[in-house]
Amino acid sequence: MLRLEFDGLFRNTDNEHTSAGIMCYGWRILRGKQVVAHGHGTFARGQNANSNIAEYLALVEGLEALLDMGVNHERVLVCGDAKSVISQMQGQASVSSPAVRPLYTRALRLARHFSKLRWQWLPRKHNRGADLLSRHALKHLWHDPDLYQSIIDRLHQAARSGLANRLLDMGGLRVYQSA
């Protein structure tokens, strides 16, 4: 059985109490106790950025990695510490946020490719592997002031162009390891 663990985090980028921000994600895929793939990355958005979107970005990236691995017919357990995301993906809760709905729909479409997929909520302390990856993406930004400033500049440019609601992909990494 494969296990996908995912996590996202959000950081506001300004002092005006808007919802502009940086959303980092991390995910890893395990076969037993062996990590066979992992990834992390960053998106930014000039408005409507939040931690739920970061969680969905992590989920979507992880599901896409599973598809890339061609494991559609294997048993897959998807685990995350965001109760709302797990409940929504299980059909137990609705998605009310228009900002989240497109990512939810995308995650649903990806999940339908797997014939034996189950969902499980994890307490945060049991999702440390994915959490460390999302934090690694954030640390990468903090340690590179030029990169961070370029993100802020792109957010301001998007806002001036009327595209503040667009997700800006600031880069990511996927690593696949042979089992």
Give the ranges of each region predicted by the language model.
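Catalytic phosphate/metal-binding cores of nucleic-acid and nucleotide-processing enzymes, i.e., regions
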Residues: 56
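RNase H-like nuclease fold core
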Residues: 1-53, 65-69, 178
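Alpha-helix boundary/interfacial micro-motifs
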Residues: 24, 98-100, 105, 140-142, ...
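Low-complexity, flexible helical/coil segments
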Residues: 37-43, 65, 112-117, 153-160
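Acidic two-metal-ion nuclease catalytic site recognized across multiple nuclease folds
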Residues: 145-179
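Intrinsic disorder/low-complexity segments enriched in polar/charged and small flexible residues
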Residues: 29, 121-123, 144
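RNase H catalytic domain
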Residues: 9-16, 60-135, 140
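Short, mixed-charge aromatic SLiMs
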Residues: 48, 83-88, 155-163
